[in-house]
């Protein structure tokens, strides 16, 4: 059985655990760097990206997470997690992990649209996935080898680059586990 970690520093941790378990995989909440060796793939959840970054610095996660990526292990960033994975963030000089060749903009759907749901067609996942957007970022641009998986109102809201998967919305907040299953399948492929 594959083991999927959820970075447990801040954000929607419990909901991701529930979704992973609903897909028949084992979930591990990651609170210590040493735990990264126990898992096959990692979800970086939604929350608040600057707070998450502060905690990642405090607990020494930045370099170990980059090493985890260098080992070829899949990583899935949702909402704030997407921002953590991105190589460029609009209005910021430095990225967080800078692993995925995308540029993201924070809170890009505007204050008046703080949260909403939208039906999405996600390539390889579903034609009718309900995305829950909460102060969501979006992907402004992608590198040449990044596959755009979904758009909403002409904005990129899900993408994949090899072992990296990212989305603007919160797939863990509904009972539709197909996006989580897609990531688990990515992890299984790397183990084969």
Swiss-Prot record:
The keyword Hydrolase applies. PROSITE patterns: PDXT_SNO_1, PDXT_SNO_2. Keywords: Glutamine amidotransferase, Hydrolase, Lyase, Pyridoxal phosphate. It catalyses: aldehydo-D-ribose 5-phosphate + D-glyceraldehyde 3-phosphate + L-glutamine = pyridoxal 5'-phosphate + L-glutamate + phosphate + 3 H2O + H(+); L-glutamine + H2O = L-glutamate + NH4(+). L-glutamine binds at residues 47-49, 106, 134-135. The keyword Glycoprotein does not apply. The active site is at residues 79, 170, 172. One of its GO terms (biological process) is pyridoxine metabolic process. Pathway: Cofactor biosynthesis; pyridoxal 5'-phosphate biosynthesis. Its EC number is 4.3.3.6, 3.5.1.2. Gene3D superfamilies: 3.40.50.880. GO terms for molecular function: glutaminase activity; pyridoxal 5'-phosphate synthase (glutamine hydrolysing) activity. It holds the Pfam family SNO. GO terms for cellular component: cytosol; glutaminase complex. In the presence of PdxS, forms a dodecamer of heterodimers. Only shows activity in the heterodimer. Belongs to the glutaminase PdxT/SNO family. Catalyzes the hydrolysis of glutamine to glutamate and ammonia as part of the biosynthesis of pyridoxal 5'-phosphate. The resulting ammonia molecule is channeled to the active site of PdxS. This is Pyridoxal 5'-phosphate synthase subunit PdxT. It comes from Anoxybacillus flavithermus (strain DSM 21510 / WK1). The lineage of its organism: Bacteria, Bacillati, Bacillota, Bacilli, Bacillales.
């Amino acid at each position: 059985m594959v083991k999927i970690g959820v970075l447990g520093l801040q954000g929607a941790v419990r909901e991701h655990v529930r979704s992973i378990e609903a897909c028949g995989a084992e979930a591990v909440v990651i609170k210590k760097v040493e735990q990264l060796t126990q898992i096959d793939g990692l979800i970086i959840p939604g929350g608040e990206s600057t707070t998450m970054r502060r905690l990642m610095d405090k607990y020494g996660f930045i370099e170990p997470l980059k090493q985890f990526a260098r080992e070829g292990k899949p990583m899935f960033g949702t909402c704030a997690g997407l921002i953590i994975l991105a190589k460029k963030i609009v209005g910021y000089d430095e990225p967080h992990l800078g692993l995925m060749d995308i540029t993201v903009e924070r809170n890009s759907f505007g204050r008046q649209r703080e949260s909403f749901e939208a039906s999405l067609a996600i390539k390889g996942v579903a034609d009718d996935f309900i995305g829950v957007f909460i102060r969501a970022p979006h992907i402004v641009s992608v590198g040449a080898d990044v596959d755009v998986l979904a758009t909403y109102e002409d904005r990129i809201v899900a993408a994949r680059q090899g072992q990296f998967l990212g989305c603007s919305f919160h797939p863990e907040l509904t009972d539709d586990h197909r996006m989580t299953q897609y990531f688990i399948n990515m992890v299984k492929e790397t183990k084969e």
